[in-house]
Amino acid sequence: MSKLSQPASTAGVNGISVIHTQAHASGLQQVPQLVPAGPGGGGKAVPPSKQSKKSSPMDRNSDEYRQRRERNNMAVKKSRLKSKQKAQDTLQRVNQLKEENERLEAKIKLLTKELSVLKDLFLEHAHNLADNVQPISTETTVANSDNTGQ
């Protein structure tokens, strides 16, 4: 097993010291800690990533600045085109669904009418059958069964 080395302290910006430690042999990585440098240091601890961005303001006339602006402008254009295309696709889908909905509603009306016609035909046929059948009295049925049994 290896031992942890002693923490090394480096003076930072705004009176903040950064304490660096080395990880032991298990491969764990430790993150640098931000600690105020002294009792009168004042201010809040700022992560190193934020410090580096604010420490060097970019010259607006530099090539790097112009390249960044150009890349940013292209990214903005691309994002806006993508957003516009998505809105158009959504609108097209809405219109397709509206048309499909209208077709389905028309089909429902047609099938409802067809069902009504078929019900009417069925009921009419059932009434015609009932009118054509003569009621059989129980006396006639008993007499017929006696005659057939001889």
Curated annotation (Swiss-Prot):
UniProt subcellular location: Nucleus
Protein name: CCAAT/enhancer-binding protein gamma
Protein family per UniProt: Belongs to the bZIP family. C/EBP subfamily.
Keywords: Activator, DNA-binding, Isopeptide bond, Nucleus, Transcription, Transcription regulation, Ubl conjugation
GO molecular function: DNA binding; DNA-binding transcription activator activity, RNA polymerase II-specific; DNA-binding transcription factor activity, RNA polymerase II-specific; DNA-binding transcription factor binding; double-stranded DNA binding; protein-containing complex binding; RNA polymerase II cis-regulatory region sequence-specific DNA binding; RNA polymerase II cis-regulatory region sequence-specific DNA binding, bending
Biased composition annotated in UniProt, kind: Basic and acidic residues: 56-72
SUPFAM superfamilies: Leucine zipper domain
Signal sequence coordinates: none
Function: Transcription factor that binds to the promoter and the enhancer regions of target genes. Binds to the promoter and the enhancer of the alpha-1-fetoprotein gene. Binds to the enhancer element PRE-I (positive regulatory element-I) of the IL-4 gene. Binds to the promoter and the enhancer of the immunoglobulin heavy chain. Binds to GPE1, a cis-acting element in the G-CSF gene promoter.
Lineage top rank: taxon: Eukaryota
Assembly behavior: Binds DNA as a dimer and can form stable heterodimers with CEBPA and CEBPB. Interacts with ZNF638; this interaction increases transcriptional activation.
PANTHER family (alphabetical): CCAAT/ENHANCER BINDING PROTEIN, CCAAT_ENHANCER-BINDING PROTEIN GAMMA
Pfam families: bZIP_2
Region spans: Basic motif: 66-93
Leucine-zipper, as annotated region: 97-118
Gene3D superfamilies: 1.20.5.170
